[in-house]
Curated annotation (Swiss-Prot):
GO terms for biological process: cellular response to heat; protein quality control for misfolded or incompletely synthesized proteins. SUPFAM superfamilies: P-loop containing nucleoside triphosphate hydrolases, PUA domain-like, Ribosomal protein S5 domain 2-like. Residues 592-773 form the Lon proteolytic domain. ATP binds at residues 356-363. Residues 774-794 are annotated as: Disordered. One of its GO terms (molecular function) is ATP binding. It comes from the Bacteria. This is Lon protease. It is an enzyme of class 3 (hydrolase).
Length: 794
């Protein structure tokens, strides 16, 4: 059937291009226009109040026609109301679809030539079914809250025309403007009805999902409101019964802790702000636990809690001597601190760094200092630490965040002035998580640590009352800025006499007690302890000495448990019987004087040691072979020594031609142990001169010193450890740089009496003292000796 519409449509009609809306037939709508858009509607009076509304495809850049869609709507101007500010409100009614044929005039008013679009809608079972389904679906959509005006609702119930129904329903679908234009351009009413039905089906599905979500939300909100009401009722009941809300009680408890924590004023303000925030948080929320834990830390940290110092210097000295033998420098420094503290109440805590080989008592000394001062003792190991957060903590935004180890340990100690030991500071690592050594810069700087800010606490904490003690085996790995902040105290290795006293005073009694021999305590003779020290240990400290004494005690305990009689005395024979064959021997004493082999002294983080530099030559092209895992510095020392020898062949009694046809090989056993450092320079030169001159190097002479290219002997470090190593190895004479003569003060008198010291300024003096004069000796320069020094060998 054909939709019959009687309208007197002129051949030419004014045109208004649409941008934001689509006009459908039978649609009554209002648009608001600016003054410059009014001409087409004012001109419509001349064209039976008709105007064509056609949507723009795109903004016109020249001619208007190509920018317009082909299908639009012919509308009737119902009313024009002028607005006070300019422009007008225009009421329009859609009449029919029209096809744009041409633009006959573009300015000042666009005039268009149109033709009506005839719509044919034959009544059929399909169209009737679609109309019925669309009406039913529309009512379902309306049940989800999509309201339509009452007059429209009444109209829909009586419309059975597919063309009119599809246009009317399309107006109220929430479709994009391009989809509406496609519906307008669908001329076949049945096809248009199918599209509208499809869009309405999607809209109903969307409304169903939205309704389900809203129902779920409403259910949850209702449950929350119900819980809230029940809690309020429970609170009222508790108040009537005189009981207190658990949450309120928890908040009151925290508030009283904040008030009694004696926090600094700025920290107190932050704590009170966090308290107010906590009171507003639901206890079931994860944020509640985070806030509660933070407040617990703030209120338990010892902001003003200090341990009173023991200022009795005599008593402090007694305690230090009870716990440790010797270590005069450290004890003197602690007593100095106590003396100043007794004169000045408020002072910054010292930051000490104990450097020395393992087993010399660095860590146990920290405990002794804490006992001396009457303070709490804290120790954390920094060895292998790579995460900066271990020092500074994590920010509270991270799950499971906690303060750093500094704040945690001070909080655990319950005092703001403990003795805090940072062990193994030379073994800190660094990776992508940061550098803990850099984080320690603030902790160990007396000028900054009064306001140390942990990332978790996010408030400053005063560390100036803390006595920080760090320990290290060597200084080189410690970053220079960190080293600069610490007062370095070097702990040297022990002499045999010191080890004997330590064993008698501390180690034997401790191991006898720990191994259940207190009632039958065996007596260790001095000779037995010396046998253990000399034949079963080779160390700077006393750790292995303690292990061997413990081993002897365990073996005696085993004999007692087997029914044997306890040994009342432990003598050297007992030691050999229980510990087996000796593990160490006097390396030098067992050697012979050899050509090309010189004895040097080295320093390691485990103490002093002796090294043998071996030189040999082979016929061949001039070359230098270096083996023994030598570092770059040591290799350069060899080259410098070789260059000196070549340059002074005549003076040293060596044929220079020998170098032209000789391959020189330098080796330092043991080959698997890396070695480096400059102090073996004179040893290298002595081995080379011994080899090419044929003069054997004395086995009982050990040397240490860096050599320059001109033969000057330069100062070295670690002389005490090297001298003790020489003594352990059976060396009789030690050659050292003249500039190290001052270091003799650190060497015990009994050691100085056992060894002969010869201090040299020039390498030629070394050759005189270290090489046997089996061939013409080189000219010697004047030597610097100790007063007790022996004359050079004859």
């Amino acid at each position: 059937m054909t939709e019959n519409i009687t309208i007197n449509m002129p051949e030419i009609v004014p045109l208004y291009p649409l941008r934001e809306i689509i006009a459908f037939p039978y649609m009554v709508f209002t648009i608001f226009l600016k003054q410059e858009d009014m001409p087409p509607f004012e001109e419509a009076v001349l064209f039976n109040n008709l105007v064509a509304l056609v949507k723009l495809r795109e903004e016109p850049t020249g001619e208007l026609f190509p920018a317009l869609h082909e299908i639009g709507t012919l509308c009737k101007v119902m009313q024009i109301n002028k607005l006070a500010g300019g422009g007008a409100k225009v009421v329009l009614e859609g009449v029919i679809r029209v096809r744009l044929l041409a633009i006959v005039q573009q300015t000042p008013v666009a005039l268009s030539r149109l033709e009506p679009v005839r719509e044919f809608a034959e009544k059929s079972m399909v169209s009737e079914a679609l109309v019925g389904s669309l009406n039913a679906l529309l009512k379902i959509a309306l049940s989800y809250g999509r309201p339509l005006p009452d007059d429209v609702m009444k109209m829909i119930d009586f419309i059975d025309n597919p063309a009119r129904l599809s246009d009317l329903v399309a107006l109220y679908l929430n479709l994009p403007i391009d989809e509406l234009q496609k519906l307008l351009e669908t001329v076949d009413p049945l096809e248009r009805l199918k599209k509208v039905y499809m869009h309405l089906t999607n809209e109903v599905q969307r409304l169903q999902i939205k309704g389900e979500v809203q129902a779920e939300v409403t259910k949850k909100v209702g449950k929350s409101q119900k819980e809230f009401l029940l809690r309020e009722q429970m609170k009222q009941i508790q108040e009537e019964l005189g009981e207190e809300d658990s949450r309120l009680g928890e908040a009151n408890e925290l508030r009283s802790k904040v008030e009694s924590a004696h926090m600094p004023e700025d920290v107190r303000r932050i704590a009170e702000k966090e308290m107010r925030r906590l009171e507003r948080i639901n206890p079931a929320s994860p944020e509640y636990t985070v806030s509660r834990t933070y407040l617990d830390y703030l209120t338990t940290i010892p902001w003003q809690v200090s341990t009173p110092d023991n200022r009795d210097i005599n008593q402090a000295e007694t305690i230090l001597n009870e716990d440790h033998y010797d270590l005069k420098k450290v004890k003197e420094r602690i007593l100095e601190y106590l003396a100043v503290r007794s004169l000045k109440d408020k002072m910054k805590g010292p930051i000490l760094c104990f450097v020395g080989p393992p087993g010399v008592g660095k860590t146990s000394l920290g405990k002794s200092i804490a006992r001396t001062l009457g303070r709490k003792f804290i120790r954390i190991s920094l060895g292998g630490m790579r995460d900066e957060a271990e020092i500074r903590g994590h920010r509270r935004t991270y799950i499971g965040a906690l303060p750093g180890r500094i704040i945690q340990e001070i909080n655990r100690a319950g005092s703001n002035n403990p003795v805090f030991m940072l062990d193994e500071v030379d073994k800190i690592g660094a990776d992508f998580r940061g550098d803990p050594a850099s984080a320690l810069l603030e902790v160990l700087d007396p000028e900054q640590n009064f306001s140390f800010t942990d990332h978790y606490l996010d408030v400053p904490f005063d560390l100036t009352n803390v006595m920080f003690i760090t320990t290290a085996n060597q200084l080189d790995p410690i970053p220079a800025p960190l080293k600069d902040r610490m007062e370095v105290i070097t702990l040297s290795g022990y002499t045999d006499e010191e080890k004997l006293n330590i064993a008698k005073s501390y180690l034997v009694a401790r191991e006898v007690e720990e191994n259940g021999l207190a009632s039958m305590a065996p007596q260790f003779t001095d000779e037995a302890i010396y046998r253990v020290t000399h034949d079963y240990t080779r160390e700077a400290g006393v750790r292995n000495l303690q292990r061997n004494i413990a081993s002897i005690c365990r073996k005696i305990a085993k004999e007692v448990a087997q029914g044997k009689k306890a040994r009342p005395i432990v003598n050297p024979e007992t030691v050999s019987e229980l510990l087996g064959a000796p593990k160490f021997f006097d390396e030098v004493a067992s050697e012979k004087d050899r050509v090309g082999v010189a004895t040097g002294l080295a320093w390691t983080e485990s103490g002093g040691d002796i090294i043998f530099v071996e030189a040999t030559k082979m016929k061949g092209k001039e070359d230098l072979i270096l083996t023994g895992s030598l570092g770059e510095v040591m290799k350069e020392s060899v080259r410098a020594a070789l260059s000196f020898v070549k340059a002074n062949c005549a003076e040293l009694g060596i044929d220079k031609k020998m170098f032209d046809e000789t391959t020189l090989h330098i080796h330092v056993p043991a080959g698997s142990i890396p070695k480096d450092g400059p102090s073996a320079g004179i040893t290298m030169a002595t081995a080379i001169v011994s080899l090419f001159s044929g003069r054997a190097a004395r086995r009982d002479v050990a040397m240490t010193g860096e050599m320059s290219l001109t033969g000057r002997v330069l100062a070295i470090g670690g002389l005490k450890e090297k001298v003790l190593a020489a003594r352990r190895a059976g060396v009789k004479k030690v050659l050292a740089p003249a500039k190290n003569k001052k270091d003799l003060e650190d060497i015990p008198e009994n050691v100085k009496n056992e060894l002969e010291f010869f201090f040299v300024e020039d390498i030629r003096e070394v050759f005189v003292q270290a090489l046997n004069p089996t061939s013409p000796a080189p000219t010697a320069a004047t030597s610097a000796r100790t007063p007790a020094g022996a004359p050079p060998p004859q």
